[in-house]
């Protein structure tokens, strides 16, 4: 169809159409091409700015994630340290309580042993005195005369000492 139109147009009008077309392009370039390219450039700039902004936001998010991860690790480390310190503190406290209880038990045991020895010594002294008095009484009746208490006590002390030595040498010993 164009070929038929071009064939029918005389040569002079082809030049006119060509000049009109060139003039139309020039007018379009002056009036419409500038604003269109400005709009296209503005849109391209907007897209580039949006891409840059997205990249910056992504980098900022990565930095924030890194900071958050670091803070989380530090918090976990601090929590672990606090738990370890609490465990050590409780173990130390427990050991102190056990040591204090053991020391108290040892003190009570020592005091009980001292009291038992004192009771034993008091009983032996009392028995010695009673035996001495009884012996003096029996001996004075048998002999018919009185032995002085100091001489008799010395005899009894010697006798008891020998009994204690024999008891120490015997296979059955007291438990203290």
From Swiss-Prot:
Annotated InterPro entries: ATP_synth_b/b'su_bac/chlpt, ATP_synth_F0_bsu_bac, ATP_synthase_B_chain
Chain segments carrying region Disordered: 75-94
Alphabetical UniProt keywords: ATP synthesis, Cell membrane, CF(0), Hydrogen ion transport, Ion transport, Membrane, Transmembrane, Transmembrane helix, Transport
GO MF annotation list: proton-transporting ATP synthase activity, rotational mechanism; proton-transporting ATPase activity, rotational mechanism
Membrane topology qualifier: Single-pass membrane protein
Major place of residence: membrane
Basic and acidic residues bias (residue ranges): 85-94
Record-annotated disulphide pairs: none
GO cellular component, one term: proton-transporting ATP synthase complex
Classification via Pfam families: ATP-synt_B
TM spans (from-to): 7-27
Subcellular location per the Swiss-Prot or TrEMBL entry: Cell membrane
PANTHER family attached to this UniProt entry: ATP SYNTHASE SUBUNIT B, ATP SYNTHASE SUBUNIT B', CHLOROPLASTIC
Similarity section: Belongs to the ATPase B chain family.
Described function: F(1)F(0) ATP synthase produces ATP from ADP in the presence of a proton or sodium gradient. F-type ATPases consist of two structural domains, F(1) containing the extramembraneous catalytic core and F(0) containing the membrane proton channel, linked together by a central stalk and a peripheral stalk. During catalysis, ATP synthesis in the catalytic domain of F(1) is coupled via a rotary mechanism of the central stalk subunits to proton translocation.
HAMAP family linked: ATP_synth_b_bprime (MF_01398)
Self-association state and partner proteins as the record states: F-type ATPases have 2 components, F(1) - the catalytic core - and F(0) - the membrane proton channel. F(1) has five subunits: alpha(3), beta(3), gamma(1), delta(1), epsilon(1). F(0) has three main subunits: a(1), b(2) and c(10-14). The alpha and beta chains form an alternating ring which encloses part of the gamma chain. F(1) is attached to F(0) by a central stalk formed by the gamma and epsilon chains, while a peripheral stalk is formed by the delta and b chains.
Protein's recorded name: ATP synthase subunit b
UniProt organism field: Oenococcus oeni (strain ATCC BAA-331 / PSU-1)
């Amino acid at each position: 169809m164009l070929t038929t139109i071009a064939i029918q147009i005389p040569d002079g009008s082809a030049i006119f159409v060509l000049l009109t077309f060139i003039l139309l392009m020039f007018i379009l370039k002056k009036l419409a091409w500038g604003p269109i390219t400005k709009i296209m450039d503005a849109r391209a700039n907007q897209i580039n700015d949006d891409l840059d902004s997205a990249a910056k936001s992504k980098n900022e998010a990565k930095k924030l994630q890194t900071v958050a991860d670091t803070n989380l690790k530090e918090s976990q480390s601090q929590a672990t340290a606090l738990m370890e310190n609490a465990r050590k503190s409780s173990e130390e406290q427990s050991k102190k309580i056990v040591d204090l209880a053991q020391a108290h038990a040892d003190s009570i045991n020592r005091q009980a042993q001292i009291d038992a020895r004192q009771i034993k010594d008091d009983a032996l002294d009392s028995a010695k005195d009673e035996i001495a008095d009884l012996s003096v009484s029996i001996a004075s009746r048998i002999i018919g005369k009185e032995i002085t208490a100091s001489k008799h006590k010395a005899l009894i002390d010697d006798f008891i000492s020998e009994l204690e030595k024999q008891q120490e040498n015997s296979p059955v010993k007291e438990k203290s």
